Amino acid sequence: MFSPGYRYVMTTDQVDTRRVLSTALVTAVDHVGIAVPDLDVAIAWYHDHLGMIVLHEEVNEDQGIREAMLAVRGAPKGSAQVQLMAALDETSTIAKFIDKRGPGIQQLAYRVSDLDTLSERLREQGVRLLYDAPRRGTANSRINFIHPKDAGGVLVELVEPASDEH
């Protein structure tokens, strides 16, 4: 979609539709997901070198990961976070990512207000989502992913926080 030299021209109707989508349904950058081989070592590094603090830690069996959400100390509630993810076993998507690419940024996540409506609109525009239906994410959020081939090579996560989050 975003190849070099490619210029995408939108009609006024398309611009209006996309602006409404982003302002009404995408509310913030939620987090940057980083694949790490050892969660405890990564947490210590971010704390010791950048002063970040752990806001939440959990095991997500569905995704096959142990994860921690970190934030800058004193950041306002709802600020973007860093998600550190370590594989529970070699079958995990994160294990496969690290085997293929090494540790590093795995995805960029946006907070959304209505994942079902946004998913429907994206599909109507020909955007591929990885899951047919949303899955459980961190802290009981609902998530889905935009295929990297439809987002300039970036794995984009869409996160609808649980009702008591953010």
Model-found features: residue ranges?
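Vicinal oxygen chelate
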Residues: 2-25, 68-69, 77, 110, ...
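Histidine-centered active-site/metal-ligand motif
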Residues: 31, 107, 147
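Short hydrophobic/aromatic beta-strand micro-patches
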Residues: 35, 71, 109-111
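Conserved active-site tyrosine of GNAT-family acetyltransferases
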Residues: 42-47, 70, 122
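A cross-kingdom feature marking solvent-exposed beta-strand/loop segments within repeated
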Residues: 18-24, 29-30, 52-55, 62-64, ...
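Conserved short beta-strand elements that form part of the metal-binding/catalytic scaffold
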Residues: 53-99, 139-162
